[in-house]
Amino acid sequence: MKTLQELTRPNIWKLKPYSSARDEYKGAVASVFLDANENPYNLPHNRYPDPMQWELKTLLSKIKKVSPQHIFLGNGSDEAIDLVFRAFCEPEKDNVVAIDPTYGMYQVCADVNNVEYRKVLLDENFQFSAEKLLAATDERTKLIFLCSPNNPTGNDLLRSEIEKILREFEGLVILDEAYNDFSEAPSFLEELDKYPNLVVFQTFSKAWGCAAIRLGMAFASEAIIGILSKIKYPYNVNQLTQQQAIAMLHKYYEIERWIKTLKEERDYLEEEFAKLSCTVRMYPSDSNFFLAKVTDAVKIYNYLVGEGIIVRNRHSISLCCNCLRVTVGTRVENNTLLAALKKYQG
């Protein structure tokens, strides 16, 4: 791995971050706050939130078994995706490499930041070759993006290939584990000490059932987290989001129950979906959704819209001709989908 200074944009490396009076305060526990020009009325919403989210990070660290200093929290995982571009990639000079197909925001953030985005096509089983991915890199490649389980394909990427990338690539490896809670594969969080170039993304939006609060997580070395924290906006995670996340962490048992139920529903829905006359092929899933090849994705998607049912039409992306991505819902929702498709006359 190159040094972090070599990977970081020079202006970011030298940047002095914004600091509030409360960041700098080292005295006794404060009871009077006259530093931030806040309105003294309408407690508690009149006060700015903790800019570093220490209470939330401390609770999260106990569940994830990662030190709070190795955790970055953002306004959704998309903030963390954008920040790694802004921190490490020089516009019009550097490039990133990613598997294809995968989550679309990696390319959106590359385009917004004017960074070349290089795609390496997956094979027919939606797996990648580390050799091919590494062959697409050059001396200006700062980041490699991997998503496991991958979106939209739903499958885990081969661990041995991920490890090869981590060993041989000199830049940062961004591993998006948004759907790892639904997988039998262990998280790469346990490998953070082994691979200093590893950055793991996770989210409260999927298994945790908190998409509305927009809270994403990045886990990495303390030095990498320090760079991301340096360039984030001062109060990027609002107080209501922090409070809701803390409440969820106190009832982790319920999240585990949801995960178990959703995995059972996934198995049920996959089995029943495979029996439909419009289904051509089912792709194995390690997530809370699956990809299915159907007779005519556009027609079936439009038919379902007319029935008040929304699925994701993935027909136009690489390797997904006539494919629909279907999220696992409740038993009632799943049966409503199945009933509608049984009536479909294609």
Curated annotation (Swiss-Prot):
Pfam families for the chain: Aminotran_1_2 (PF00155)
Biological process, per Gene Ontology: L-histidine biosynthetic process
EC number: 2.6.1.9
SUPFAM superfamilies: PLP-dependent transferases
Keywords assigned by UniProt, alphabetized: Amino-acid biosynthesis, Aminotransferase, Histidine biosynthesis, Pyridoxal phosphate, Transferase
Annotated family: Belongs to the class-II pyridoxal-phosphate-dependent aminotransferase family. Histidinol-phosphate aminotransferase subfamily.
Subunit structure and binding partners: Homodimer.
Name the UniProt record assigns to this protein: Histidinol-phosphate aminotransferase
Class of this enzyme: transferase
Catalytic activity annotation: L-histidinol phosphate + 2-oxoglutarate = 3-(imidazol-4-yl)-2-oxopropyl phosphate + L-glutamate
Cofactor(s), by name: pyridoxal 5'-phosphate
Keyword presence, Transferase: yes
Keyword Transferase tagged: yes
Transmembrane segments: none
Species of provenance: Bacteroides thetaiotaomicron (strain ATCC 29148 / DSM 2079 / JCM 5827 / CCUG 10774 / NCTC 10582 / VPI-5482 / E50)
InterPro entries from the UniProt entry: Aminotrans_II_pyridoxalP_BS, Aminotransferase_I/II_large, HisP_aminotrans, PyrdxlP-dep_Trfase, PyrdxlP-dep_Trfase_major, PyrdxlP-dep_Trfase_small
Gene that specifies this protein: hisC
Record PTM N6-(pyridoxal phosphate)lysine, positions in chain: K206
Molecular function as annotated in GO: histidinol-phosphate transaminase activity; pyridoxal phosphate binding
Annotated metabolic or biological route of this protein: Amino-acid biosynthesis; L-histidine biosynthesis; L-histidine from 5-phospho-alpha-D-ribose 1-diphosphate: step 7/9
